[in-house]
Amino acid sequence: MIEIESNKKKDYQSILTDDALNFLEKICLTFESSRQEILENREKMQQSISSGSKLSFPKDQKIRKDNWTVTPPPPDVANRNVEITGPVDRKMIINALNSGADVFMADFEDSTSPTWKNLMDGQVNLFDANNRKLEYVDPKNEKTYALNEDSNTSLFVRPRGLHLDDKNVLIDGKPVSGAFLDLSLIHI
């Protein structure tokens, strides 16, 4: 069962919907044990390296030597010569999407201080950007910022890393993965 303090949920009901939280619960039930295994293996590898072991390629030469390819990127992101990365605040998203860059990557990990307010406001901002309803009025000078109608910058999202938990959302009393939460809210 998912738990979120009611005072933390009430301001973000537009994104913390039943569908989003049900999706989060499914992701956690499906992938949490694998995530924990990955984190344990990462810790073991770090201990091994710290003890003097050298890195080496895994014994999967067949994959590296095989003749395989990946699907080409969609045409609208095939050219990524200019890419901006930044926090998920409204003004930054608007300016980045209006910049003419090929891609703006909204960054929930390194560019955003991980407070509940910043993270949830960021989710609201992405929802509004995807629906082309993102506006911001600067409280200092009352200047209004809005998405240009002709903006064609692609919006990418970098969720928090798999190693970061979100203590504000619990399943069975345990914090959920920040990455799982970010992806669940973006997905819906």
Give each language-model segment a name.
Residues 13-62:
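Low-complexity, highly charged intrinsically disordered N-terminal segments
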Residues 47-91:
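Long amphipathic N-terminal alpha/beta scaffold segment
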Residues 78-89, 165-178:
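Active-site mouth loops of central-metabolism enzymes
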Residues 80-86, 104-106, 153-157:
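Hydrophobic faces of well-ordered beta-strands that scaffold small-molecule active sites
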Residues 87-89, 109, 158-164:
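Active-site beta-loop-alpha junctions enriched in small/polar residues
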Residues 102-112:
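Short acidic catalytic loops
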Residues 112-159:
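A short alpha/beta connector and helix-capping loop motif
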Residues 186-188:
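Conserved small/polar residues in nucleotide/adenosyl-binding loops
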